[in-house]
Amino acid sequence: MFSPPHRLSLPVPATVPHANQQFPRFTEGFLMQELLEYAASSQDEVCALIIDDTRLYPCRNVHPDPAHHFRISDADWLAAEEEGEVTAVFHSHPQPVPVLSGADRTMQVMTGLPWWLACNGELRKFRPVPHLLGRRFEHGVTDCYTLFRDAYHLCGIDLPDFARTGGWWLRGENLYLKNLTANGFHQVSASEAVPGDVIIRQPFPGADPCHAMILLDDNMVLHHDHAGHLSRREPFRMAYMKQTHSIWRHHRCSSLDLRGISADISARSH
């Protein structure tokens, strides 16, 4: 978990490299291995900055509770910037929580950088997507599929983007049903639906189904429609049930960690 300092700051081991020390450039596979070994070197959260996408710049974790949080000092951040462009923030979670915390997401959005997380011997790279709640609708940019894709990304499953122009649901393009099938989803019945499943709605009679919602706990849904609303979480009400065309589940649903969504929502709610 990231704890915001007075400026932006992150964590380093007891021995920290000096700013004038040369850092080797790594291939992607070697860099990933170095990051995982670095994470395994401590029972506390470790952190680093990635320089030019190729170099690891370890930072000291100066947070008073390093077992659960991390903080990078101004001095380490500034020293890293002297080495090159900071292109990502790296840290570890010693606890088995392989998604960004609410505090992590708050600071990731502020930095606008990819955040890389080591947990359970694996490395995940998170894009700096906007918070899930409160987005303004722009078709093809921040629309219902963008929200669906970004939410799944924060939960550990990456989906491709696809080109779409307004009114596709009136031209027989049927983008949702075609792309869901092509990207590892299969239909389930309403009685089988569980949190994390994707509800596809058909709001316009005679048109293709064109709206996606993610089912959450307590019969809530996360979605972003074109009715002038911001992206939001709300009850799965009767009107939505009547418009439901189908419900879909990803074949890697066991890897979908919904704590990624709840952490982001908690960050946005504070």
Specify the residue positions occupied by each region the protein language model found.
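...with weaker cross-activation on analogous glycine-rich loops/strands in unrelated enzymes
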Residues: 166-231, 236
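Conserved beta-strand-loop surface patch within small alpha/beta domains used
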Residues: 1-88, 94-127
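Second-shell loop/turn segments in exported
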Residues: 132-138
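Glycine- and charge-enriched low-complexity intrinsically disordered segments
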Residues: 234-270
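Extended, compositionally biased flexible segments
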Residues: 81-94, 223-224, 230-231, 235-246
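Active-site nucleophilic cysteine motif
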Residues: 138-155
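Short acidic alpha-helical/loop segments enriched in Asp/Glu that coordinate divalent cations
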Residues: 158-168
